[in-house]
Structure formats: structure tokens, C-alpha cells
Amino acid sequence: MNKKPLILGIESSCDETAASLITENEQGIPVVLSNIISSQVEVHKEFGGVVPELAARSHMEKIDLIVQKAIIESGRKVEEIDAVASTAGPGLIVCLSVGLSFGKAFAYALNKPFIAVNHLEAHALSPKINLELNYPYLLLLISGGQDRKSVV
């Protein structure tokens, strides 16, 4: 029996700090073991939109706790993590830098690979978490200031 990889994913592209642990089942279907999200809606509400500097500061304040909670909720140990992935873009650069720096440092500390993830490509492939996809499929993606119509 092959060991299934355990990946720590980190998201900080805009106004949510998130961490998740994911693996796969025997059929190769992704299995989400934990998914912790901290929203910044209240932080930005009075400004009528996301303030990048405030968003980045909020990420810095919360990212360690969010990752810890994700690991605990997954029921796995930090030593079992095989790789760390973080959103690399598109997104707000000051926010992305928080997740990327944390993810790279975490991977380095564990002596594990680091994976930079394209935010839009991840959205495009996220249906695989709950569905068996038949390629090609039509994708309409609207995320923040980005939109795409594609055949995947």
C-alpha cells in the first residue's frame, strides 16, 4: 500500500487567512482533512472594501494560529506533512507575501518541498475535490478582480 501524500495548503491572497490539510483516498480522490478560515469582513467593513495593508497585518496576526488549528483538526501530526503549498498569485502582493513567507519557512523547517500555487488554477481544479471530472470541461471563473472562461 502506497503512502498517500499529506499537503498543508495556505491561502492569503486577499482578505481571508486559510489553512487546510489534504490527502487522497485509494481512488486518488482528494480528501480534505481540515479547512480553517479566518474572515476579515469586520476589519474592512467600515472602508467599503479591502484595505491591503490592514489585510496583510491581519494575515500576519492570524496565520500561525490558523495553521496550528488546521493541523490539530486534521488529526495528523506536523511530522506527517509531506509538502507545504501556498497561494502565489494572483492576489494582493502584500497579502500573498505573508502566506508565501510563512509557507516557505514552514516547509524549510520541516525539510519538505514547497509548492507555489496559482490561485486561479486552483479554483479551476477545485471541483475535483467533490466530483469525478471528465476532461475537457467548460470553466467560468469569477474571483475578486479576475475572471476567466476556459476549457480545462
Residue map of PLM features:
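Short acidic/glycine-rich loops and adjacent helix/strand connectors
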Residues: 1-152
